């Protein structure tokens, strides 16, 4: 048994905080303008009608309505359906 810990053992022991990514409002849920719908890295979901994209690829509602997920041109898109 070694009486010393080893060369690199004290250099370990760090961990980063979770980034809390993912879908925050799901399909059919009602959102207000400015509410965050998806937090993501890269464009897993693309912005559709009444949806904006932030500098960190976060999708947010541009107007109040209900969230709708769909596919357009082979891409997953998020739309906000405004009640008539």
Curated annotation (Swiss-Prot):
Record's keyword annotation contains Ribosomal protein: yes
One GO BP annotation of this record: translation
Polar residues bias locations: 7-19
Region (Disordered): 1-21
Domain of life: Bacteria
GO molecular function, one term: structural constituent of ribosome
Ribonucleoprotein found in the keyword field: yes
Cellular component GO terms held in the UniProt record: cytosolic large ribosomal subunit
Pfam family, one: Ribosomal_L27
PROSITE patterns: RIBOSOMAL_L27
InterPro entries: Ribosomal_bL27, Ribosomal_bL27_CS
Keyword annotations from UniProtKB, A to Z: Ribonucleoprotein, Ribosomal protein
Similarity field: Belongs to the bacterial ribosomal protein bL27 family.
HAMAP family: Ribosomal_bL27
Protein's recorded name: Large ribosomal subunit protein bL27
């Amino acid at each position: 048994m070694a009486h010393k810990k080893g060369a690199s053992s004290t250099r370990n022991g760090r961990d980063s905080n979770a980034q809390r990514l993912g879908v925050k409002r799901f399909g059919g849920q009602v959102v207000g303008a400015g509410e965050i719908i998806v937090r993501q890295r890269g464009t897993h979901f693309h912005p559709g009608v009444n949806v904006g994209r932030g500098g960190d690829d976060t999708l947010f509602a541009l107007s109040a309505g209900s969230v709708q997920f769909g596919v357009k041109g082979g891409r997953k898109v998020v739309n906000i359906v405004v009640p008539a």
